[in-house]
């Protein structure tokens, strides 16, 4: 999977710009606040129909403009395909092959990306919410079924929380509606939990040998999925559903008193253990960086296995955060197989030989100077 061209109109600090992309490595050089990260963000946004930096799409529109447009031509095993995202202050529109997609679940997955930025260290040391978002973003790119199940779960969760709040405030008395919502809630909670558990298992199988290679077999990495709803995965679907319903039924009064759902995938977490110790609590900064790097490289391999093509890798000012050995391991792993976009303030310290003669672009005040 390669991005041949990227065209932006009124995106962030860009007026109109076209980037003809190198199939291997593209290095975007420039001082801070010139637009390097905006370019990477536009590729991410084109892939996932949302930015990783803001939840407000209006911020993506250039100052004093009415709209923003991102368009990319994608090469993949079946040929080429244009993807378009049009953003206005009222909403957004996405197209595949010039055909509008009515649902984002139909759109996401055509262009797969893996982003690695300094803030991705928060996957290890940050809050559970960050790790849940990590699962949803990566798993959502390779499974439209998961995206749909997650959307249904979030819809029912919102309805259930609204009803619990009304019960707490005494605006509602009837628990029958809560029981109905719990039934629907349990069904999609089980589906989301099942898919997350499988994803973490697959990711761990790929991350373990990568981590061992980076540390010269001195450290062993393990990933542990910590679901809020704990049930026996070996049971059949009906038995698992019954087990979840039992948990929800036993805690119905607690949830009513609190006015919020206390159990479900929205409260899941993951732990990353290095040599049997929780990396979030006990890991050094170096161990946390190695863990994050191992996870990102495992994501790349997992997407290739599931989709049949390597994703595009976005490295946002991250090489400066890695020491020489980690940087070399990253670059040697991706060379010749993963199209990569790198932002940096300087090419000093980047091994050009390993990066296979990259194409350099200088970014200055929203303009690309080759």
Swiss-Prot record:
GO BP annotation list: DNA replication; DNA synthesis involved in DNA repair; double-strand break repair; SOS response
Matches recorded under CDD domains: ABC_RecF
Functional description taken from the UniProt entry: The RecF protein is involved in DNA metabolism; it is required for DNA replication and normal SOS inducibility. RecF binds preferentially to single-stranded, linear DNA. It also seems to bind ATP.
Transmembrane annotation, as ranges: none
Name of this protein: DNA replication and repair protein RecF
Protein family membership: Belongs to the RecF family.
Pfam families: SMC_N (PF02463)
One example GO MF annotation: ATP binding
Entry keywords, A to Z: ATP-binding, Cytoplasm, DNA damage, DNA repair, DNA replication, DNA-binding, Nucleotide-binding, SOS response
Chief location of this protein within or outside the cell: cytoplasm
Gene coding for it: recF
Keyword DNA-binding among record annotations: yes
KW Amino-acid biosynthesis (keyword) present: no
Organism: Staphylococcus aureus (strain USA300)
Gene Ontology cellular component annotations, sorted alphabetically: cytoplasm
Residues that, per the record, bind ATP: 30-37
Compartments (UniProt record): Cytoplasm
PANTHER family xrefs: DNA REPLICATION AND REPAIR PROTEIN RECF (PTHR32182:SF0)
Classification via InterPro entries: DNA-binding_RecF (IPR001238), DNA-binding_RecF_CS (IPR018078), P-loop_NTPase (IPR027417), RecF/RecN/SMC_N (IPR003395), RecF_2 (IPR042174)
């Amino acid at each position: 999977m390669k991005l041949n061209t990227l065209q932006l109109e009124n995106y962030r600090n860009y007026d109109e710009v076209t980037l003809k992309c190198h199939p291997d490595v593209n290095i975007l050089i420039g001082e801070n606040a010139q637009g390097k990260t905006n370019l990477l963000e536009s590729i991410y946004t084109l892939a996932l129909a949302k930015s990783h930096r803001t939840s407000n799409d209006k911020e993506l529109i250039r100052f004093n403009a009415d709209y923003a447009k991102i368009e990319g031509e994608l090469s993949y095993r079946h040929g080429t395909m244009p993807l378009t995202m049009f953003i206005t202050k009222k909403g957004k529109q996405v197209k595949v092959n010039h055909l509008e997609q009515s649902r984002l679940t139909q759109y996401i997955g055509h262009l797969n990306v893996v982003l690695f930025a300094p803030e991705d260290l928060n996957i290890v040391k940050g809050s559970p919410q960050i790790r849940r978002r990590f699962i949803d973003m990566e798993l959502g790119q390779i499974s439209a079924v998961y995206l749909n199940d997650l959307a249904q779960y979030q819809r029912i969760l919102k309805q259930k929380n609204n009803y619990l709040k009304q019960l707490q405030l005494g605006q509602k008395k009837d628990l029958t509606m809560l029981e109905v919502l719990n039934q629907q809630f349990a069904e999609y909670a089980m589906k989301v939990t099942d898919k997350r558990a499988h994803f973490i298992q697959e990711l761990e199988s790929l991350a373990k040998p990568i981590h061992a290679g980076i540390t010269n077999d001195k450290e062993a990495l393990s990933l542990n999925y910590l679901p809020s709803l704990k049930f026996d995965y070996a049971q059949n679907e009906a038995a698992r559903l019954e087990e979840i319903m039992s948990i929800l039924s036993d805690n119905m009064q607690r949830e009513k008193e609190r006015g919020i759902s206390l159990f479900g995938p929205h409260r899941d977490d993951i732990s990353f253990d290095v040599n049997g110790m929780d990396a979030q609590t006990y890991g050094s900064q170096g161990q946390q960086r190695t863990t994050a790097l191992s996870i990102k490289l495992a994501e790349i391999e997992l997407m290739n296995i599931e989709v049949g093509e390597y994703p595009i890798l976005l490295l946002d000012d991250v090489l400066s955060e890695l020491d020489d050995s980690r940087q070399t391991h990253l670059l040697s792993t991706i060379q010749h197989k993963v199209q990569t976009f790198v932002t940096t303030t300087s090419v000093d310290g980047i091994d050009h030989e390993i990066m296979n003669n990259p194409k350099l672009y200088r970014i200055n005040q929203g303009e690309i100077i080759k």
